[in-house]
Design a protein with these regions (language model features):
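Conserved N-terminal segment of class I S-adenosyl-L-methionine
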Residues: 1-97, 109, 124, 201, ...
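Secondary-structure boundary/linker elements at domain or insertion junctions
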Residues: 81-82, 112, 177-179
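Helix-loop segment at the mouth of the active site in Rossmann-fold oxidoreductases
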Residues: 98-100, 117
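A short SAM/SAH-binding and catalytic strip from SAM-dependent methyltransferases
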Residues: 107-118
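S-adenosyl-L-methionine-dependent methyltransferase catalytic module, highlighting the catalytic core
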Residues: 118-122, 126, 136-252
């Protein structure tokens, strides 16, 4: 295993909140690492129709385009400056009702999104619908009971939602450039009410596997993101030990 990408990941991660440009560098490096992971499991983006679902600040989207994908971005928020500058097709929409006809895409990226939507089964059903026969979905999320499962509320999420919200508000120092994107509602009484139109919901590995089976997805690979050891595969304890789970899913050919 080449350690250099991981050392770079740590370095960029420490700097990511300095500016929007620094955050894009961090996201794009992660995307390159993920593209290598996908290639190892037989998934190439070059020349493929790709949907970046929950495109956010746009770093991943930019990299998928640079890797040769015909990329379409979708987010609940307005398009990011990076996506606009890259002239990447974008639509502002809800992931529960994707504005695409059936069998539109070869690959759908759904990274760190499923834990932010109410009704994850609706999201997965829509992803399956817009994928072509034999299509691929990259799905990732931090299991709720892991140390990163509470996102910006970690590690306070172990203490219950109301206390976690109060403690996170007290200790949270958000840079000005990011504040307009992800400002926590001061009136929020639960993780689900945290943001404007979306929140944080409890998603576990066990729940995700059950929903994927119900939806019809086959799991080509299942692992712990950016770690050579698959802690997510450890029964029960994987829910706590795996900081971030990722899966390569495929539809029926």
């Amino acid at each position: 295993m080449n350690p250099h990408p991981y050392l770079t990941l740590v370095r960029l991660g420490r700097r990511r909140l300095r500016s929007y440009a620094d955050y894009l560098l961090f996201q794009r490096h992660q995307a390159r690492m993920l593209s290598e992971y996908l290639e190892q499991h037989g998934v190439s983006l070059h020349g493929r129709e790709v949907l970046d679902l929950g495109s956010g600040l746009g770093g991943y989207t930019m990299e998928w385009k640079a890797l040769g994908g015909h990329v379409f971005a979708l987010d609940l928020a307005t398009s990011s400056p990076a996506i606009k500058a890259g002239r990447i097709p974008f639509v502002q929409a809800n992931a529960h009702s994707l504005p695409f006809v059936d069998s539109t895409f070869d690959v759908v990226f759904c990274a760190s999104l499923i834990e932010h939507v109410r009704g994850p089964e609706l999201l997965l059903g829509e992803v399956y619908r817009v994928l072509r026969s034999g299509g691929i979905c990259y799905l990732s999320f931090p299991p709720f009971y892991s140390f990163r499962g509470g996102h910006e509320f970690s590690p306070f999420h172990y203490l219950g939602e109301r206390l976690a919200l109060r403690l996170a508000q007290r200790d949270r120092d958000v840079p000005d450039w990011l504040r307009n994107h992800y400002e926590i509602r001061s009136s929020a009484q639960s993780f689900a009410e945290t943001y404007d139109g979306w929140g944080l919901y409890r998603v576990t590995i066990r729940q995700a596997r059950r929903l994927l089976k119900q939806t019809g997805f086959k799991v080509r690979h299942f692992g712990t993101r950016f770690l050579p050891v698959n802690l997510a595969a450890v029964p029960i304890l994987g829910e706590i030990l795996a900081w971030h789970v990722h899966m390569i899913l495929e539809t029926d050919a």
